[in-house]
């Protein structure tokens, strides 16, 4: 009887439907078969993720323009030379290009928190080279507004922060910051509008948890840096120590 149930074509179709709902048949990056790849990307797209390396701005981590006359060491972009950010340093895993962009969109908007596992090997390789720089830090994430959290079903930055805290073996601060104001979408706003849009959108709700603590602040994408900059402002207002930022992608 049990063998008949296991071999049932109907049960097989149901199982296949469940698997396909969780893991897409085609590659999220290119739409082709996921041959030689993982659960979300094919082998070629996994290899095509562009991991950011030197030369880059020492403060915000933006890759240096190859046509720019930058020094071998100590390069700072124009914005950072003006003292444009409140965080101490920011780094991103890769460029927000076609593959990483599609994977992040799938991760965020298709309720697929498991997609972060596709990037885990890159995260481990990245932090293996700079683990000492984050020793003594506590990990925190840029929070979603409660309304957006209910719509999405999970907080993508918190999931990422949890993964990074495991990789670095660092304590994870659970919700020391909250988003107290729902903000308009940033996509079509210029730099000035983005900074204004997130002004006073966050609050530190557990000041003791961040007091004199060095914080590794996690978010998914760094575009202008307005969001992580505003969260940093609130953390430092609550007397946090050094604040370093890490995002999956740099747009």
Please place each PLM-identified region on the residue numbering.
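Glycine-rich phosphate/pyrophosphate-handling loop used in enzymes and phosphotransfer proteins
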Residues: 1-219, 223-251
């Amino acid at each position: 009887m049990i063998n008949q149930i296991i071999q049932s074509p109907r049960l097989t179709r149901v199982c296949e439907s469940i698997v396909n709902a969780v893991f897409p048949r085609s590659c999220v990056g290119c739409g082709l078969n996921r041959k030689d790849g993982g659960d979300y990307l094919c082998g070629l797209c996994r290899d095509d993720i562009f991991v950011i390396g030197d030369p880059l701005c020492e403060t915000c981590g933006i890759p240096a323009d190859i046509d720019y006359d930058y020094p071998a060491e100590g390069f700072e972009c124009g914005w950072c030379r003006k003292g444009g950010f409140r965080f101490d340093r920011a780094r991103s895993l890769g460029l927000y290009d076609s593959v990483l962009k599609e994977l992040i969109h799938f991760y965020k908007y298709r309720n697929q928190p498991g997609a972060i596992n596709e990037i885990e090997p890159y995260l481990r390789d990245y932090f293996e080279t700079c683990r000492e720089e984050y020793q003594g830090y506590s990990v925190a994430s840029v929070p979603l507004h409660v309304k957006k959290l209910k719509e999405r079903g999970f907080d993508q930055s918190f999931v990422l922060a949890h993964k990074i805290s495991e990789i670095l073996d660092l304590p994870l601060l659970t919700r020391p910051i909250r988003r107290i104001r729902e903000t308009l979408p940033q996509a079509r706003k210029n730099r000035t509008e983005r900074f204004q849009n997130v002004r006073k959108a966050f609050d530190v709700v557990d000041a003791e948890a961040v007091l004199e603590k060095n914080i590794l602040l996690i978010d998914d994408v760094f575009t202008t840096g307005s969001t992580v900059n505003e969260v940093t402002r609130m953390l430092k207002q609550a007397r946090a120590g050094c604040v370093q930022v890490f995002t999956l992608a740099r747009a």
